[in-house]
């Protein structure tokens, strides 16, 4: 089996109104060799059924999808950790299940990471609400120290869902989410 370029981790809990758009945007990515890990955090609604229905529409991606089920709700950090433990890709991308992404997002981030030999790359994003949407431009930095300072000072948003992170960074530094 070919090693995945990117493992996408998607926690699922009470998102039946959003999950279809999220999964479609992931299944239609232009990047090949993507592993999709969906973690059902004991969601009591129909989110996982919707997920399965959408995955069926994409037979070429179906074998790249893992659905892991928690027997009880453990919370978002635990769901992310479950996904990390299963991930095999060179890079990790976290996607919240109420998000949707541009169709070339993973390819753009992956190509930039490879071009720069980067451990972490990030992108701008939109915050979408029922009545409006805001474009959130993220600053660019040329050194790791500058990026870290910006993250710690709040100049750059610290969300995980707009960043592609080398999996070895998690493994080598024993990084997990506080659960």
Give the positions of each predicted feature.
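Short aromatic/hydrophobic "clamp" motif used to bind/position activated sugar donors
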Residues: 92
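The conserved acidic donor/metal-binding loop of glycosyltransferases
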Residues: 96-100, 119
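Short, flexible, basic/aromatic active-site loop/helix in glycosyltransferases
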Residues: 124, 136-155
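Conserved nucleotide-sugar donor-binding catalytic segment
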Residues: 149-179
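Conserved donor NDP-sugar-binding/catalytic core segment of glycosyltransferases
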Residues: 104-135
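Glycine-rich, basic loop-to-helix element that forms the pyrophosphate-binding segment
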Residues: 69-87, 108
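Acidic donor-binding segment of Leloir-type glycosyltransferases
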Residues: 23-69, 114
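N-proximal low-complexity "stem/linker" segments adjacent to membrane-targeting elements
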Residues: 1-28
């Amino acid at each position: 089996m070919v090693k995945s370029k990117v493992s996408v981790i998607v926690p699922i809990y009470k998102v039946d109104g959003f999950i279809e758009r999220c999964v479609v945007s992931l299944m239609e990515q232009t990047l090949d060799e993507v592993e999709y890990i969906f973690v059902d955090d004991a969601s009591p609604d129909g989110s996982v059924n919707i997920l399965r229905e959408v995955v069926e529409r994409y037979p070429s991606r179906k074998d790249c999808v893992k659905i892991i089920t928690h027997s009880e709700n453990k919370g978002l950090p635990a769901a992310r950790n479950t996904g990390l433990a299963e991930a095999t890709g060179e890079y990790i991308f976290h996607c919240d299940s109420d998000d949707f992404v541009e169709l070339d997002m993973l390819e753009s981030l992956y190509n930039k990471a490879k071009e720069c030999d980067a451990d972490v790359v990030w992108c701008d994003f939109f915050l979408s609400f029922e009545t409006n949407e805001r474009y959130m431009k993220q600053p660019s930095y040329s050194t790791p120290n500058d990026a870290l300072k910006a993250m710690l000072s709040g100049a750059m948003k610290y969300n995980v869902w707009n960043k592609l992170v080398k999996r070895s960074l998690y493994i080598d530094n024993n990084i997990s989410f506080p659960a």
